[in-house]
């Protein structure tokens, strides 16, 4: 064995398997690119992003951890979101929740 060596199981890794998903169309109405990270509370993203924020409450992007989606000025695209799991507590970001999400 080599220190740090990984022995992954055979087959593909399915991200967020079995999670409910939500697809929203998001447009960048600003004049600069906006990047959103994998675990950012999507409802609290940059206000220049135009989408149904109420529907996005309690959701994050359905992308691999540590990655991000970039929205160029004037660009609109569909994104897939998954709900926060665990205790469903959202703290920080833009300070709009800072506690337990209502279900």
Swiss-Prot record:
Major localisation: cytoplasm
E.C. code: 3.5.1.5
Molecular functions per Gene Ontology: urease activity
UniProt xrefs under SUPFAM superfamilies: Urease, beta-subunit
Protein's pathway: Nitrogen metabolism; urea degradation; CO(2) and NH(3) from urea (urease route): step 1/1
Keywords, comma-separated and alphabetical: Cytoplasm, Hydrolase
GO CC aspect terms: urease complex
InterPro entries associated with the record: Urease_beta-like (IPR002019), Urease_betasu_sf (IPR036461), Urease_subunit (IPR050069)
Localization of this protein: Cytoplasm
Family label: Belongs to the urease beta subunit family.
Name listed for the protein in its UniProt record: Urease subunit beta
Originating species: Magnetococcus marinus (strain ATCC BAA-1437 / JCM 17883 / MC-1)
